[in-house]
Design a protein with these regions (language model features):
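The feature primarily captures lumenal catalytic ectodomains
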Residues: 1-254
Length: 254
């Protein structure tokens, strides 16, 4: 009975939001090319390795805060820059679950100007590893394209964790620009900028592809974090994982 009621409720919600925003359709390659500007950035003189930065005008972003993020222009879900995960890997945009469920929230925030979008579902909301290896490298890609403070807003997976605020401080960004994606799941932007993910590949496991993360990005992050004045050396370092939501990879301090 409860399952049937939930199913009916979801159908009603979807129909209502389809009336408001239109039924979502997967965009064609032609629509994508006509509406998405693509720029390339490089981290070194090695022109064999580049990263795309995607720019879209007048669009929406909706996240289910799980495994799907939809970047929507008019009523079209844009492939390549929307995110859909399955079995710990990036899958084809046609499998984005938001195509089925629709956007289940009204627009929570409208932003005038250019929004840098870094959200990617649940993976980086609380997970330190995904934050360090996914979100910060995407910030580095965006920084190669444009001064981060030139963006009018920066849409992040979460800004509640201390490690998130601490690591962002090394980029010198005005915190007033931050939008908390864990609370604000549906936005409209006059202009949206999305940097390419540093290592995700379609139908490739994340644990396999993370080994291919660009050494130039790692070195750039290392330079940012190590550029600290008057650091006192310590014989030992205490690492605390007690606030982690994950019970694997725990550390014993001696």
């Amino acid at each position: 009975m409860k399952k049937n009621l939930k199913k009916i409720y979801r159908i009603i919600v979807k129909k209502n939001f389809d009336i408001i925003y239109g039924k979502l359709i997967l965009a064609s390659e032609v629509f994508f090319k006509n509406n998405v500007l693509v720029k390339k950035v490089f981290f070194s003189n090695n022109k064999g390795r580049s990263y795309n930065v995607y720019i879209v005008d007048n669009c929406r972003v909706y996240s289910d805060n799980s495994e799907n993020v939809a970047v929507i222009k008019n009523k079209y879900l844009l492939p390549k820059i929307s995110i859909q995960l399955g079995k710990n890997q990036l899958i084809e945009a046609s499998n984005n679950n938001i195509l089925k469920t629709g956007t289940r929230k009204l627009i929570q925030k409208k932003v005038k100007g250019n929004v840098l979008c870094l959200i990617q579902g649940i993976s980086a909301i609380n997970n330190y590893g995904h934050w360090i290896l996914d979100i910060l490298p995407k910030l580095c890609v965006a920084e190669k394209y444009k001064d981060l403070n030139d963006f009018d807003a920066i849409y992040l997976p979460n800004i509640k964790k201390k490690f998130q605020i601490d690591s962002l401080s090394y980029f010198g960004i005005n915190p007033n620009k931050f939008i908390d994606g864990s609370a604000i799941r549906h936005i409209y932007a006059e202009k949206l900028t999305i940097p390419q993910h540093p290592y995700w590949k379609i139908n490739k496991g994340q644990l396999d592809t993370v080994a291919n993360i660009d050494p130039d990005i790692i070195n750039l992050l290392k330079q940012k974090f190590m550029n600290i004045q008057n650091v006192t050396k310590a014989k030992r370092i205490f690492i605390d994982r007690s606030d982690s939501n994950f019970f694997h990879n725990q550390i014993i301090n001696y």
